[in-house]
Amino acid sequence: MALFAVAMIAVGFGASGCAKLKARDELNKGVAAYRDGKYDAAIEFFKDAKDNDPTLTNAQLYLATAYATQYIPGAPSPENIRMGEAAVKQFQEVLQGDPNDISAIDGIGSILFNMAGTPYSREKFDESKSYHMKHIALKPEDPEPYYWVGVIDWTLSYRANLEARGTWRLAHPGKPLKDDDPLPADVRETYIKDNGTMIDEGITDLRKALELRPDYDDAMAYLNLLLRRKADEAATPDERASLLKQADDYVEKAKEIKQKKMETPAKP
């Protein structure tokens, strides 16, 4: 009986080892298909790899990424929505095993951001931001999550700005209020109350991104945009003009850096 038990254990280990080898083979096939743009085939390979070895984190990450790659932001088809939701689910499964997996944290933050725009979902934007903040908590030296917090804060504050102007125009027919005009005093007060803290957060985080990566031209572009939202909080023309001047300066800096990057040969 003892020998039989030992033999059965050996068989079990052998079967487990074979399954893990098969999982890695399926993973490699999936990676090759993914690199060739054959995403449907890649998904099936990654699924098989995951089934054969549920502990193979790379299979889960690649499966989630393959779903996310096929997701088209704003496309309303049920299949497209299913792709986005499947990506979220797979990234969440990775985080259940390792809550500090940066790749999964970034992946879910990215797909939620893409899913939040159309149809608009404030909840998804906020959830996306929470994942980028998790990245910051784990690796505060990385500039990218600060950038994404700034992008989300601008996206939300810009939408709120347009809505505030639209509501005022409807209530005051015949009175012009252009998108770059100062906000009326009552609208400005409400806008600051609802968005002021978020705008300040975005500006702070984008400046942090630039502190960590001084040539981060995309961060400069969004800092310019958020400073324009900050200008809508200004109570005096001089304060508004100063903020708009700062915004314009970042536009010029971003242009200079982009031009410099274009003129610099890529490293081999």
Walk through the language-model features, giving the residues of each.
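Short coil/linker segments at helix-helix boundaries
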Residues: 23, 40, 68-93, 113-130, ...
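C-terminal motif of bacterial Sec signal peptides marking the signal peptidase cleavage site
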Residues: 14-17
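Post-signal peptide N-terminal segment of mature Sec-exported envelope proteins
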Residues: 24-70
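Bacterial signal peptide processing site
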Residues: 19-21
